């Protein structure tokens, strides 16, 4: 059983650094926008002690752990749907993911360019989600024409799906993300094949500096991000991508010592 997660965010927020930490890869993570162009894919086994305990009882020929496949795509910018930056065509690479990891820059660093010119995690989240929503609107618009044609021909399934689209599409055009639109579980199931990006479970990953990660209390800016996540109904975590990447490259004994030092 495997889970697939797509990593999104603005350029220079640490997506590739975090991808490297998660997958123990060594893809370039440079200080310039669009360092990542082609998608990077890494598969990670999920440790589970219960699996080892069960194997000890039944002694199977092979043990197959659960996996997570991470897909790191190029950074999106404001106006990507209109061709800004590298555009949004590479969003097709995460269309079939089960969840979205939205990496948000939450650290100050003069030597690392911020494409928006200043640090504002909530603004950056809204920028990315707007671009994802515009992509979803285009997907629904394309599907709508076919549904209407099939419904006129008496296709019952098309009629059912069309009823849901008639609820969802106007709200999307008002700027409402799909997962924020009130639908029954059956209605949401009908539009699942569309693989809409703003309908997927989303985790905000606040990429912070070492001082922030060592602090028990969140900074004012970081707290705003967590409050925003709660309003959205999404989860949020903080981590230091740079530190995690360093830890992932250590030998097991060194890693234990390092983690103890950083508590």
Feature names for model-found ranges:
Residues 42-47, 74-84, 95-156, 171-184, ...:
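Conserved Switch II/interswitch segment of TRAFAC-class P-loop GTPases
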Residues 23, 27, 55, 59, ...:
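Signal for well-folded cores of large energy- and translation-related assemblies
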Residues 91, 134-137, 237, 263:
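Short amphipathic alpha-helical segments with heptad-repeat character
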Residues 1-113, 142, 147:
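Conserved G1/Walker A P-loop phosphate-binding module
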Residues 68-70, 94-97, 125-129, 228-232, ...:
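Glycine-rich loops and low-complexity Gly/Arg-rich segments
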């Amino acid at each position: 059983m495997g889970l697939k997660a797509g990593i999104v965010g603005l350029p220079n927020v640490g997506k590739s650094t975090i991808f490297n930490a998660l997958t123990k890869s060594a893809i370039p993570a440079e200080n310039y926008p669009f360092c990542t162009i082609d998608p990077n894919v890494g598969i990670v086994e999920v440790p589970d002690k219960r699996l080892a305990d069960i194997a000890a009882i039944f002694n199977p020929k092979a043990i197959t752990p659960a996996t997570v496949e991470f897909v790191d795509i190029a950074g999106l910018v404001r106006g990507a749907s209109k061709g800004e930056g590298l555009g949004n065509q590479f969003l097709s690479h995460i269309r079939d993911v089960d969840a979205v990891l939205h990496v948000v820059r939450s650290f100050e660093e003069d030597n690392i360019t911020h494409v928006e010119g200043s640090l504002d995690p909530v603004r950056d989240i809204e920028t990315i989600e707007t671009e994802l929503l515009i992509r979803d609107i285009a997907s629904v618009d394309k599907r709508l024409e076919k549904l209407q044609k099939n419904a006129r021909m008496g296709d019952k399934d098309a009629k059912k799906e069309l009823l849901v689209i008639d609820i969802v599409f106007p709200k999307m055009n008002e700027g409402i993300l799909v997962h924020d639109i009130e639908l029954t579980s059956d209605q949401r199931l009908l539009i699942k094949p569309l693989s809409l990006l703003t309908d997927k479970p989303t985790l905000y990953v606040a990429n912070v500096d070492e001082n922030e990660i060592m602090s028990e209390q969140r900074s004012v800016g970081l707290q705003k991000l967590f409050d925003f996540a709660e309003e959205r109904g999404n989860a949020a975590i903080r981590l230091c991508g740079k530190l995690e990447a360093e830890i992932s490259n250590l030998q097991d004994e060194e890693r234990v010592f390092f983690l103890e030092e950083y508590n």
